[in-house]
Amino acid sequence: MGKVHRPRRGSLGFSPRKRAKSIVPRIRSWPKETEVRMLGFAGYKAGMTHILMIDDEPGLTNGKEIFMPVTIIETPPLRVFGIRAYRMGYLGLETATEVIVPDFPLDNYPAKERKGKPKPKMTFYKLLERRIATLPKNYTQEMFEQKLGQLEDMIKEGEIVDVRAIVATQPWVIKLKKKPEVMEYAIGGTSVEEKFNYIKEKLGKELRVGEVLKEGELLDVIAVTKGKGTQGPVKRWGIKLRAHKDSKGRRKVGSIGPWHPARVMWTVPMAGQMGFHHRTELNKRLIAIGENGKLKLDENTEIEITPKGGFPHYGIVRSDFMMIAGSVPGAIKRIIRVRPAIRPPKKKPPVQRPQITYVSVESKQ
């Protein structure tokens, strides 16, 4: 019998397999685009269903009806509340300054009304609880305009090389939770001036998913995967079960290494943390964008995307949503971030919504 070569099924490229630092995923690389728009969006995973659609991609099934599993991500409007400016430092980009809008009341926040007491007024900064840049106690509109003017001068002098939008989610709009996630998004464009003007126009306002993304385009999905806790090497690394007459365990590694070097190598498959890892999945197609929990199939037909009995462990989709082809990492209700594809294939599907002939809204219970 020849030499049996069976490497582990798990990649060492993801080691060490430990828990993500934050449940809010980070994005370190951005695509280069000439169109001036925010490069991505964020939402909450509602669940999966399936559709029938006319295939518009080149291939054997082009023009035919195909089955497609899809993930529904609910995307309540993001609130743009700041600008972060970068300059080129010795080791690369470094933060030059930040401009945050003055505090404002949240009219759509579901504050509880207690007996005999007036309804409490929730403001944006009170909700964030110090999760933004430190601000003076009496941060007025005049101070905000002064800082904005200083940033404009820095851009004109050529000191600033990039500007990005600081945004916050609004999960209370969909009755999911109260505390928002704060994150940063790059802006497409050819010059710093046009990027700055885009954010300046949106400051303090809400941004909907339909204003940012296009139906049919390819996206990269960034999320923290489902946590599995401590698992053994068979499930964690996909090693083979040992033979029937092997001693001292069956779901173990046969050998953890040679006598010398007299230490256990880091490459040996071991038990440990599995899941709750930060992962990016490339080139997921955005099939459709819906509004207020409804998907428009044609001029006369509009359906509720929520299946009978609601999405399991999630409930009803009330706001805007994205319908993305295939599965998406992460648990139900978890924050999911997307960006335009950074490494799209040579043969890209057309940037338009494919013709959807059927959407399953049967119970998923």
UniProtKB/Swiss-Prot annotation:
Keyword terms of this UniProt record: Ribonucleoprotein, Ribosomal protein, RNA-binding, rRNA-binding
Span of the signal peptide: none
Transmembrane segments: none
Family annotation (InterPro entries): L3_arc_euk, Ribosomal_L3_dom_3_arc_sf, Ribosomal_uL3, Ribosomal_uL3_arc, Ribosomal_uL3_CS, Transl_B-barrel_sf
Entry's Gene Ontology BP terms: translation
PROSITE patterns linked to this entry: RIBOSOMAL_L3 (PS00474)
MF terms (GO), sorted A to Z: rRNA binding; structural constituent of ribosome
Biased composition (Polar residues): 354-365
Region of interest (Disordered), ranges: 343-365
GO CC annotation terms, alphabetical: cytosolic large ribosomal subunit
Cited function: One of the primary rRNA binding proteins, it binds directly near the 3'-end of the 23S rRNA, where it nucleates assembly of the 50S subunit.
Matching PANTHER family: 60S RIBOSOMAL PROTEIN L3-RELATED, LARGE RIBOSOMAL SUBUNIT PROTEIN UL3
Family to which the UniProt record says this protein belongs: Belongs to the universal ribosomal protein uL3 family.
Subunit and partners: Part of the 50S ribosomal subunit. Forms a cluster with proteins L14 and L24e.
Protein name: Large ribosomal subunit protein uL3
Originating organism: Pyrococcus furiosus (strain ATCC 43587 / DSM 3638 / JCM 8422 / Vc1)
Gene: rpl3
